[in-house]
């Protein structure tokens, strides 16, 4: 091997190994002091904190905001809508029967979608949900933000801790009322009672429900 060819090979290996060495150092925590300087800690508060930005969380947040409450809506994805968003594409399929349709806020979002998205593109459907939320002045929306823990005051939730890895931001979000609309029961971290599966139709007098009382669950986004 000539000196020239050795230099070329050594340079190529250095180029490959340098990022690997940096990645290993990061994984081993060698850069934590530097990273800590870039992490922002933000404290927020609202009347109602909604965890989960699927359709249930969106409807809860918008309804509360229109009744005068201040709301913080925390969604761990870059879009709203959950299983009905462009990420999963289940759509709105809750109404049972050929002649039945969704009403209320769901119908409002669908009408906005039909008006501005006649070809029913899922990416524009995301915009219809998003605009419904951001047009409400009482709602603060946190996308790409995951609830990871709760802060208890006795037997009540005083705050939730959340993390946005894209913005390197940690949130402490205080509230009076907390709504778990994640679909995953994340606020069970508080020790609150929760259930897994479907309830019996008779439990809440759900006349349109013809089955239940089992361990079936939906997928999630």
Label each region the model flagged.
Residues 10-22:
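Bacterial N-terminal signal peptides
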Residues 51, 173-183:
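Short hydrophobic core segments
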Residues 57:
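N-terminal Rossmann-fold NAD(P) dinucleotide-binding loop
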Residues 44-46, 167-177:
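Core beta-strand elements of the Rossmann-like FAD/NAD(P) dinucleotide-binding domain
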Residues 1-12:
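Bacterial N-terminal signal peptides that target proteins for export
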Residues 180-221:
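Glycine-rich loop(s) and the adjacent beta-strand/alpha-helix scaffold that form part
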Residues 40-54:
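Beta1/beta-strand and adjacent pyrophosphate-binding region of the FAD-binding site
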Residues 27, 37, 45, 63, ...:
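Conserved N-terminal/central alpha/beta ligand/cofactor-binding core
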């Amino acid at each position: 091997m000539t000196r020239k060819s050795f230099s070329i090979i050594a340079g190529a290996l250095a180029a490959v190994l340098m990022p690997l060495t940096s990645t290993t150092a990061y994984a081993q925590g060698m850069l934590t002091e530097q990273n800590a300087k870039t992490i922002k800690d933000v404290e927020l508060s609202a009347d109602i904190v909604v965890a989960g930005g699927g359709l249930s969380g969106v409807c809860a947040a918008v309804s509360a905001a229109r009744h005068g409450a201040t709301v913080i809506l925390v969604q761990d994805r870059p879009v709203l809508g959950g299983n009905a968003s462009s990420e999963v594409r289940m759509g709105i399929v809750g109404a049972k029967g050929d002649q039945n349709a969704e009403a209320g806020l769901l119908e409002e979002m669908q009408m906005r979608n039909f008006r501005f998205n006649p070809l029913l593109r899922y990416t524009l459907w995301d915009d219809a949900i998003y605009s419904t939320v951001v047009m409400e002045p009482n709602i603060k929306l946190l996308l790409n933000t995951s609830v990871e823990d709760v802060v208890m005051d006795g037997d009540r939730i005083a705050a939730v801790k959340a993390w946005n890895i894209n913005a390197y931001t940690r949130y402490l979000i205080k509230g009076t009322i907390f709504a778990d609309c994640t679909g995953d029961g994340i606020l069970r971290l508080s020790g609150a009672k929760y259930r897994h599966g479907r309830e019996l139709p008779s439990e809440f007098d759900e006349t349109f429900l013809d089955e239940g009382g089992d361990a079936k669950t939906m997928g999630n986004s």
